[in-house]
């Protein structure tokens, strides 16, 4: 085990440093407060041997919250995902702590978008899935901490980065690809608006207004962004809490 320390420059810089310091051909990611179950690395290695050439190898995972541990909605089939962008619309396929990426893939598409503080995982997955297939195992071998993910600052600070979801838009790509880019960008805009980033959220509304599949999310961002800033955080917090309770009950 090698411990590397550096000044806090964000999660993307930390991941990129870890990738640079690592020596293996397959790089597994594990965020703070998340955990692996016994057999996770063995399953990743097994998939890499059975389905070579994929850009991401992921397993199913559990969501850990204040009120327990619950299985995330994920595919039930093991193997290469037919269409990552379509199949990710209503269920999880890849999250960092339940995934591994071949070193050669990072060398081809680049590392995580340094300076991006919201949506950096989806940005990375989009870049990879655009060029490579994704492999998935339905075995729940990782645990994602929803508690830790809710600890981010409630005050919006504009990102200082050259990366954005706008650059991922491709008019020549299949509709499913651009729709997924819009979904990721509008989901980020919802968080930004809730934190008070009115102008940046409005920019996302204008740019990604082309979406047909995620009109509901688009309207949600528009409505939230039109409200007084002091209302937005509590309102989206209440909405997310209710949505989580409904999802847990399978409604």
Labelled PLM ranges:
Residues 81-83, 87-88, 140-148, 152-179, ...:
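Catalytic core of nucleotide-sugar-dependent glycosyltransferases
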Residues 197-251:
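Membrane-interface aromatic/basic loop that binds lipid-linked glycans or pyrophosphate carriers
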Residues 189-192:
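Conserved small-residue packing positions in alpha-helical repeats and bundles
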Residues 185-186:
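TPR repeat positional signature
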Residues 1-158:
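Nucleotide-sugar donor-binding/catalytic module of glycosyltransferases
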Residues 54, 135-138, 178, 199, ...:
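Generic macromolecular interface patches on structured domains
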């Amino acid at each position: 085990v090698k411990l590397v320390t550096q000044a806090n420059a964000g999660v993307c810089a930390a991941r990129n440093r870890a990738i640079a310091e690592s020596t293996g051909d397959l790089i597994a990611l594990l965020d703070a407060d998340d955990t692996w179950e016994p057999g996770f690395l063995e399953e990743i290695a097994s998939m890499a041997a059975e389905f070579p050439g994929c850009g991401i190898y992921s397993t199913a995972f559990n969501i850990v919250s204040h009120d327990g541990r619950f299985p995330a909605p994920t595919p039930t089939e093991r193997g290469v995902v037919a269409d990552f962008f379509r199949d990710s619309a209503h269920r999880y396929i890849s999250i960092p702590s339940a995934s591994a990426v071949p070193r050669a893939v990072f060398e081809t598409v680049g590392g995580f978008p340094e300076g991006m503080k919201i949506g950096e995982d989806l940005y990375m997955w989009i870049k990879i899935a655009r060029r490579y297939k994704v492999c998935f195992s339905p075995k729940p071998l990782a645990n994602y901490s929803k508690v830790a993910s809710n600890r981010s600052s409630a005050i919006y600070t504009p990102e200082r980065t050259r990366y954005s979801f706008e650059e991922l838009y491709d008019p020549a790509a299949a509709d499913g690809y651009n729709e997924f880019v819009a979904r990721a960008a509008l989901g980020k805009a919802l968080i930004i608006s809730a934190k008070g980033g009115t102008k940046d959220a409005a920019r996302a509304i204008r740019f990604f207004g082309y979406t047909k599949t995620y009109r509901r999310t688009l309207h949600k961002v528009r409505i939230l962004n039109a409200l007084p800033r002091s209302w937005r955080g509590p309102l989206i917090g209440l909405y997310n809490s209710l949505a989580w309770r409904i999802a847990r009950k399978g409604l």
